[in-house]
Amino acid sequence: MDSTTEKNVLIIGGPNAGKTHFGGQLYGRLNSRKFNYKIAPHNRPSDLTIFQDVLDKLSEGKRAGHTEASANRSIELKLEDENENKIVFSFPDYAGEQVKSIVENRRINAIWKQYIDRSDSWMLFVRIDEIHPLEDIINRGIPSPEEIQKRRVQTPPVKVSDGAFFVELLQMLLYVKGVSTFNKINMPNLTVVLSCWDVPTFPENTIPSEILMKTLPLLYYFVKNNWAENSHSIIGLSSTEKTLSDEPDEDYIDRTPIDFGYIINPKGEKQEDLTISINSIVGK
């Protein structure tokens, strides 16, 4: 009797949320066979070029370019541990454009529904350095006479706050999966990933959940109030450890991409092995 298990992790995030570098760095670590997890040899996907392209760029000391909308295809990264338990990281929308469309159009297509139905765990990528505070009567400046006149002629569009966007997204995914919020959610396991953690230069031992509570309180309390304590986590992630550009970075050239990158675990501790987080992501 086969005692191995398979877990399915759904990767969720909009454009420029950090999924590209995460996928490439995870792929590089799995390929190196230096860690507890490896790419499943019998289920190796035929098309992993998008991950390899990221690694090639990083090996040159350059950032990987923004994934084009034309790359909105489904990608799966299948791995297994030393006991041959399998984990599938699914990227149904690698470029992230469809995530925006889901919320804007209140519609989830058939491909997304398949991935949602079979998922055990979700990774929600939130790029923490691009969260914009919502203007209100307290922090909004007085508009100029020209701006007032412009608003009289054309009413500005209503902008949904970042927190409301993510909450709406999670509510739609839960609805499609048939998960009620009347009771605390145990499955799917949820990991909120605060990506590009290195950009804001947080103090050492900063707790990721505290940052989420300050920057996106609506999302923070939605997660805290609806998921069971042992079925969700909030972590920080820097896939590249430093900001890269189109100019070569000598440190990356002298070393290898898998020597860079780290996570900040829920306790605020820095861990350089990105694969360490896999157990908590799948709810082990």
Located regions from the model:
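Short, flexible loop/turn elements at secondary-structure junctions
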Residues: 15, 79-81, 95-98, 194-198, ...
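Switch II of P-loop NTPase G domains
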Residues: 66-122, 129-138
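Conserved GTP-binding G-domain of TRAFAC-class P-loop NTPases and closely related GTPase folds
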Residues: 114, 121-125, 130-284
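Amphipathic alpha-helical scaffolding segments
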Residues: 24-30, 96, 108-109, 139-143, ...
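Extracellular structured ligand-interaction cores
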Residues: 6-8, 72-74, 86, 119, ...
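Alpha-helix-centered segments that form part of catalytic cores
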Residues: 59-78, 160-177
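Short, glycine/acidic-rich beta->alpha junctions
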Residues: 3, 104-107, 215
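Conserved G1/Walker A P-loop phosphate-binding module
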Residues: 1-69, 84-89
